């Protein structure tokens, strides 16, 4: 199971504490953490996941692997800048948003547009025309965020071609479960 954790690269100490706890709890539940791979919330969640033996994937905006925070196991360079937010959001079965700026807002939008559940801890509020129909699932603690994300991720169906990459007609699409299995095998080797 792959859970994205998103948030600002320059976060408050409270957001960093929440992210680190989320990372610890996700790793304890066997989830792979995917994030933008840089600092702030991304670094804190990776640090938390690594502290309990978890696997972390960082989708980096540039082409320099050395920009990844030290707790990223699998740094993936994209050269896409902020467009890599699509990859972060669509690679997950659920997304946990902690705080965040406009980059986080874009990841929330990509996830929601693609039917991926978003759980929010002190993050953006989205409603249309002042209505109370915020599609972000609000929680009050790291434990509640992880429990909700795991529960929803188990129900989230990975559809054929549900990938930010378009496979060629002659290739078979890689499903989220297959990526999770491959990452789990790699984790056992580490």
Over which residues does each language-model region extend?
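Glycine-biased, low-complexity coil/linker segments
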Residues: 176-177
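Polybasic, lysine-rich low-complexity intrinsically disordered segments
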Residues: 160-161, 188-189
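C-terminal binding/interaction regions
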Residues: 7-10, 82-145
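Glycine-rich beta-alpha loop segments
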Residues: 1-57
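Glycine-rich oxoanion-binding loops at beta->alpha junctions
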Residues: 59-95
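Short, hydrophobic alpha-helical segments
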Residues: 149-157
